[in-house]
Amino acid sequence: MAMFRSLVASAQQRQPPAGPAGGDSGLEAQYTCPICLEVYHRPVAIGSCGHTFCGECLQPCLQVPSPLCPLCRLPFDPKKVDKATHVEKQLSSYKAPCRGCNKKVTLAKMRVHISSCLKVQEQMANCPKFVPVVPTSQPIPSNIPNRSTFACPYCGARNLDQQELVKHCVESHRSDPNRVVCPICSAMPWGDPSYKSANFLQHLLHRHKFSYDTFVDYSIDEEAAFQAALALSLSEN
């Protein structure tokens, strides 16, 4: 019996380490950033709660005085956010099938592959028409302005999405005293294109840490929309 146990133990030691649970089908989901919903890119981990995000995705959270984890909403020390080297190693080791052509690709190269995969592009072209995440009785016009990108009110830099605008203004215009119009608010139905914020950076970090387009019913006024969007954002986490 002792010899049998010894042989079993020896065989177990020679077996390669198992990959993540769930097999190939759930592999990509296990390494998906909760913010951008894509495979991690340059992942970082919050020291206190251990949650992992793409480095760029977490950046806007690091610009506020008292940052909260986007996933669990617990406060964390921005100085204790470290590069998730163990996750990076796993991204380079594990393969998963492309969601379009089913070709197996290492997770570290999945974003690049998907961006050029003809099957994925074909699927995207055939996507159903957008519908709101919250039911609404209001009609959805087809000619609404594109609120996805904005221009910097300080220097005019264009094609910035909401997170990029926050990051750009914090990094490039932190000390700029000029009063400027918020391009995000002015694009809203209730927005006043002539109203200039006395402290635009504070306004940007307070009001625009989430996307209005994801949560807002545009038929209600600004304050009601903000409160509704904030409540829905919190309820989803």
From Swiss-Prot:
One of its GO terms (molecular function) is zinc ion binding. It catalyses: S-ubiquitinyl-[E2 ubiquitin-conjugating enzyme]-L-cysteine + [acceptor protein]-L-lysine = [E2 ubiquitin-conjugating enzyme]-L-cysteine + N(6)-ubiquitinyl-[acceptor protein]-L-lysine. The keyword Repressor does not apply. CDD domains: RING-HC_RNF166. Its EC number is 2.3.2.27. Pathway: Protein modification; protein ubiquitination. This is E3 ubiquitin-protein ligase RNF166. It comes from Homo sapiens (Human). The gene is RNF166.
